[in-house]
UniProtKB/Swiss-Prot annotation:
Organism expressing this protein natively: Corynebacterium jeikeium (strain K411)
Family in the record: Belongs to the LamB/PxpA family.
Protein name, UniProt field: 5-oxoprolinase subunit A
Database matches in Pfam families: LamB_YcsF
PANTHER family (UniProt xref): 5-OXOPROLINASE SUBUNIT A (PTHR30292:SF0), UNCHARACTERIZED PROTEIN YBGL-RELATED (PTHR30292)
Function: Catalyzes the cleavage of 5-oxoproline to form L-glutamate coupled to the hydrolysis of ATP to ADP and inorganic phosphate.
GO molecular function: 5-oxoprolinase (ATP-hydrolyzing) activity; ATP binding
Length: 258
């Protein structure tokens, strides 16, 4: 989150480019008209080359910042299942995904500007030392010192900072939080929030106060550099539009963290 004397600004991001085989899971064209950053799938957890390319073109047309949404090589499980990689293998797969996406991005008039791990990888590197280090090594090997979008307090953030990479602290508009600041498992009731009004007010609170109400009603303090709105959630576009409207009504602008 950035501030001036008279206003606040917050980055809104969404996971996009996840269509495989012509079966869309999100309305990417509509989402890039709302968000300021797009986490674009790289073909490992989801997405095929043509769909990814179309999403990149739409992002470029709307001046939306592009990030590589790297994930485990598991389309069948949508990248939401833990895989016990060797560190070298994981680092290579992360580097491969960034490079492939950047090649497509440049052909569509944009480029990869940051990295956000997906799903099980994202959650694993909150606490898993070996995988956290490997993911950061893969990102660093790309050579562009790309910022890394992570859950606040993640072990991976320590490795990123040691590697000289900027850490973007991410909060989730539509996900429930445990009191310790981790995300409630999707297997639990109430893990995903669906009421646009509730979610919109929550995002304003994140931006203005830097706090989130946990699932037990307690208050969590956090740093919100970027807020994620899931593009594949039911009613994702309507929710993103409501969030944008609520931010605007509270004099909070939507803008990239870069």
């Amino acid at each position: 989150m950035s501030t001036t004397r008279s206003s606040l600004s917050i980055d809104l991001n969404a996971d996009l480019g996840e269509t495989t085989g012509g079966n869309p899971v999100s309305d990417d064209a509509a989402m890039v008209a709302i968000v300021s950053s797009a986490n674009v799938a790289c073909g490992f957890h989801a997405g095929d080359a043509h769909a990814i390319s179309n999403t990149l073109a739409a992002a470029a047309e709307n001046n939306v910042t592009v990030g590589a949404h790297v994930g485990y090589n598991d389309q069948a499980g949508f990248g939401r299942r833990f895989i016990d990689y060797s560190p070298a293998e994981l680092a290579d797969e992360v580097l491969y995904q960034i490079g492939a996406l950047d090649a497509l991005a440049k052909a569509r008039g944009t480029q990869v500007r940051y990295v956000k791990p997906h799903g099980a990888m994202y959650n694993t590197i909150v606490h898993h030392e070996a995988q956290a280090k490997a993911v950061i090594e893969g990102i660093k090997a790309f050579g562009a010192d790309l910022p890394v979008m992570l859950l606040p307090g993640a072990v991976a953030a320590d490795y990123a900072e040691k590697a000289g990479l900027r850490v973007i602290n991410e909060v989730f508009a539509d996900r429930a939080y445990n009191p310790d600041g981790t995300l409630v498992s999707r297997r639990e009731n109430g893990a995903v929030l669906h009421d646009p009004e509730v979610v919109a007010r929550r995002v304003v609170r994140m931006a203005e106060e830097g706090t989130i109400e946990a699932i037990d009603g307690s208050t969590i303090r956090t740093t919100a550099d970027s807020v994620c709105v899931h593009g594949d959630s039911p009613g994702a576009v309507a929710m993103a539009e409501r969030i944008a409207a609520e931010l605007q009504s509270n004099n909070i602008t939507i803008g990239s963290f870069l």
